[in-house]
Amino acid sequence: MATDYYAVLGVRRDASQDEIKKAFRRLARELHPDVNPDPKTQERFKEINAAYEVLSDPQKKQVYDLGGDPLSQAAGGGAGGFGAGGFGNFSDIMDAFFGTASQRGPRSRTRRGQDAMIRIEVELDEAAFGTTKDIQVDTAVVCNTCNGEGAAPGTSAQTCDMCRGRGEVSQVTRSFLGQVMTSRPCPQCQGFGTVVPTPCPECAGDGRVRSRRTLTVKIPAGVDNGTRIQLAGEGEVGPGGGPAGDLYVEIHELPHSTFQRRGDDLHCTVTIPMTAAALGTKVPLETLDGMEEVDIRPGTQSGQSIPKHGRGVTHLRGGGRGDLIVHVEVTTPGKLDPEQERLLRELAKLRGEERPTGQFQPGQQGLFSRLKDAFNGR
């Protein structure tokens, strides 16, 4: 290092900015050409000015402390510098080493906000035909006190004095290739290029506050469990008053007491006595469209399904609706009085069903009996 700037000002290497400033002012009053016209004193005055220029600037001081001389490029390169003759400033040096790396510039304080999600419950008929619902959401909104700027009323953001608004600072590192200058986001302004000296008291400088709002959501016909409805721009407002993200409304369909939904079809079960199954009947059923009758034809068997077309859920995409599938369950009486038993026996006799058709008939051998006879040689 060609010049010890700390020695020039007579301060320690860990001196504060206030100590550096006081030392410079004291020497400047003593060595100013108007006070002391001696030529040697004038050279000394130039030295303290150069030392103060470096040590009072956090960026230049950092470069100097890491082994570089931030003033060397002004003289076309020096013994302890980069030999950077022809470069106008640090940006020129960065361009030479890293191309466009130093042209990133400060990042914007205004950024898009995050998306938000809320889950709402709907009844089956609401999902089938569509509806509108008022929902309450708690998201970040623009602070009305500072209009998203983050600064207290009557104040504004100021250019960062560490990076001079560039959003990044340069530093010198030593490697086997020699001294290399690199850049990184400014630690004082976090890369924004500006700082907020007096933050807004309402949002603490963030530019956003939490707020509960009421929104009206249109639920389209045909939504199902897990369907997400996107509300553009209704999510979290971004930092610095940036545009809001989107709000996603996730549908949770509540179970129905009668119907089970499978896709756009609805399923239900009706229970009828065996006499109704044999003779046929009409069963009243409350559907999504109101009271209707299910036509049970004579001879209907337990487990048989009867479709009612177009009585299901509206198709979410395209027209039309799914079906209502009615499953029939036939019950058998568990206890009969003597008269009922007599009548059933008479019916069985008339139908030739005194002996159950599935009963094992005498003289017939089962599989295991035949295998046993074969093993015994019979």
Curated annotation (Swiss-Prot):
Zn(2+) 2 binds at C160, C163, C186, C189. Binds 2 Zn(2+) ions per monomer. CXXCXGXG motif repeats lie at residues 143-150, 160-167, 186-193, 200-207. Residues 358-367 have a biased composition (Polar residues). GO terms for molecular function: ATP binding; heat shock protein binding; unfolded protein binding; zinc ion binding. SMART domains: DnaJ. A zinc finger (CR-type) spans 130-212. Residues 297-319, 351-378 are annotated as: Disordered. The keyword Chaperone applies. One of its GO terms (biological process) is response to heat. One of its GO terms (cellular component) is cytoplasm. SUPFAM superfamilies: Chaperone J-domain, DnaJ/Hsp40 cysteine-rich domain, HSP40/DnaJ peptide-binding domain. CDD domains: DnaJ (cd06257), DnaJ_C (cd10747), DnaJ_zf (cd10719). Zn(2+) 1 binds at C143, C146, C200, C203. Coiled coil: none annotated. It is found in: Cytoplasm. The J domain is necessary and sufficient to stimulate DnaK ATPase activity. Zinc center 1 plays an important role in the autonomous, DnaK-independent chaperone activity of DnaJ. Zinc center 2 is essential for interaction with DnaK and for DnaJ activity. This is Chaperone protein DnaJ 2.
